[in-house]
Swiss-Prot record:
UniProtKB keywords: Capsid protein, Virion
InterPro entries with a match to the protein in the record: Closter_coat (IPR002679)
Name this polypeptide is given: Minor capsid protein
GO cellular component term, pick one: viral capsid
Pfam family, one: Closter_coat
Organism: Grapevine leafroll-associated virus 3 (isolate United States/NY1)
Family: Belongs to the closteroviridae minor capsid protein family.
Protein origin, superkingdom: Viruses
Subcellular location(s) per record: Virion
Record function comment: Minor capsid protein that encapsidates the 5'-terminal portion of the viral genome.
Length: 477
């Protein structure tokens, strides 16, 4: 066991970085290093890399299968190729395990385990005979059980690697990585042959008990660090990447909420929207809308762990409807879900009604999404009483998203409920069941209208139980 130096692969979500790959056609045409960036060494690193996110999980079982082709052509005498998986939490601590093939030593392949916690890295590379560090297999199946901060590794069902302890207990994502490290200074994206990339080919990566879906990710194009295949870069949907936006100072001249909400960057990942409230943003399929979730702590929001579990169930619902994990399908699902709960979240009879549904597009087909099935996915089969309203506290994560959709007339307001409570037309976008507004973003009259709508809704519910009902929000002014 010894210390090692962490080298970042520089995951990026900027559209500009994707565009820079188009002109990165030789080592001499590499984009300039960012200001302040210091290269860790003189090696060039090229990556095949994918990522999968899942709800915060303490214990996992990971099985990595790798095919080794030691005689592959194209490697230089000093090249090294490794394939591995990397478990990571939200603060960047990680555990990595895999196999590294070193070209100068034809029979030398190293099984390595690494942990990187709080800025300090430790690596274990003991070989199967504990002295030479050598492996020489045609294929590897690495089984790793991570339980309560301890990783136990078994290779090809026979050899047990040294345990790694002191690991985090809050894993939220996993990376699948094949990496080429070379002294060749003339490398660039797209210059690698299939045989060179296939020296340590990952055949499969299984994770339990969570369900995962891998997607290609973008790396910042640097002269000595980049995505190995240009097609992987081009396959990344533009709508899933961020577009830098100018910082607009707070206006005192009556700027409305719509303008304030539009000057943000874009993404379409529901998990990130929940995980980074205050920085969470979402771009819908037509790339017109931008929403910034308010950075406030409030116990009226569902706890993040539960919210991410709901997100996983919603993803499964999309798959069951013939959709996929693409930004377009997930964006369509989010819009449809919001529309359903704007219209039907306060209905008196929450049992199934055929009319409580909306039509959307999933998997390039028109499908119906019903209020009952989305509500069931959110509740996860738990219909008993709880100290909070699970549906409402989950949907509050999408409050500002909903307001922008209503302002842009992308969804319909609940006209019957609004008319029943006498909500003036100009306050329509701000008065719905799960609206939760931040006074940094909205003028006083909007905040007052929202507060009064909440008060009238509560009062109406109480009065109904006594045989009377309030009909106009203005009655309480």
């Amino acid at each position: 066991m010894g210390a090692y130096t962490h080298v970042d692969f520089h995951e990026s979500r900027l559209l500009k970085d994707k565009q820079d790959y188009l002109s990165f056609k030789s080592a001499d045409e590499a984009p300039p290093d960012p200001p302040g960036y210091v290269r860790p060494d003189s090696y060039v690193r090229a990556y095949l890399i994918q990522r999968a996110d899942f709800p915060n999980t303490q214990s996992l079982s990971v099985t990595l299968s790798i095919a080794s082709n030691k005689l592959a052509s194209g490697l230089m005498g000093s090249d090294a190729v490794s394939s591995s998986f990397m478990l990571m939490n939200d603060v960047g601590d990680y555990f990595e395990c895999g196999v590294c093939h070193n070209k100068p030593y034809l029979g030398r392949e190293v099984i390595f385990c690494r942990k990187y916690i709080g800025g300090r890295g430790v690596e274990i590379t003991t070989g199967k005979n504990y002295t030479s560090n050598n492996w020489n297999e045609a294929s590897y199946v690495i089984q790793v059980n991570v339980v309560d901060g301890l990783a136990q590794t078994t290779v090809n069902s026979t050899y047990t690697q040294t345990d790694v302890s002191g690991l985090p207990k809050n894993w939220t994502r996993i990376y699948k990585i094949t990496k080429i490290v070379s002294v060749d200074q003339n490398l660039y994206p797209g210059c690698f042959s299939d045989s060179k990339l296939g020296v340590m080919r990952i055949r499969s990566l299984l994770v339990s008990p969570v369900r995962i879906f891998f997607r290609d990710i973008l790396l910042k194009p640097l002269k000595k660090s980049f995505n190995a295949r240009i097609e992987d870069v081009l396959n990344i949907d533009d709508t899933s990447l961020l577009v830098p936006s100018p910082v607009v100072p707070e206006s005192t001249g009556g700027v409305g909420p719509s303008e304030q909400l539009d000057v943000v960057a874009l993404t379409s990942d529901v998990t990130e929207l929940i995980n980074t409230r205050g920085q969470g943003k979402i771009c819908f399929p037509d790339s017109v809308l931008s929403i910034n979730e308010a950075d406030i702590y409030d116990e009226r929001y569902l706890p993040i762990t539960e919210a991410l579990q709901i997100n996983a169930r919603l993803r499964r619902l999309v798959l069951s409807k013939g959709g996929s994990q693409t930004p377009r399908d997930m964006g369509n699902m989010i819009v449809a879900m919001i529309q359903l709960f704007v219209l039907y979240s306060t209905v008196k009879n929450i049992s199934v009604k055929d009319g409580y549904r909306v039509e959307t597009e999933l998997g390039q087909k028109r499908v119906y999404l019903s209020y009952s099935e989305v509500r069931e996915a959110i509740l996860g089969g738990k219909y008993g009483a709880s100290p909070t309203n699970t549906v409402r506290s989950f949907m509050r994560y999408f409050a500002h998203t909903t307001i922008t959709l209503l302002i842009e007339k992308k969804i319909q307001p609940a006209c019957t409920a609004l008319a029943k409570h006498g909500v003036p037309k100009r306050f329509t976008p701000y008065c719905f069941d799960f609206a939760l507004l931040d006074n940094r973003y909205y003028p006083a009259d909007v905040l007052k209208a929202n507060a009064m709508a909440c008060a009238i809704a509560i009062k109406s519910a109480n009065l109904r139980r006594k045989g009377s009902e309030t009909y106009n929000i203005l009655e309480s002014i």
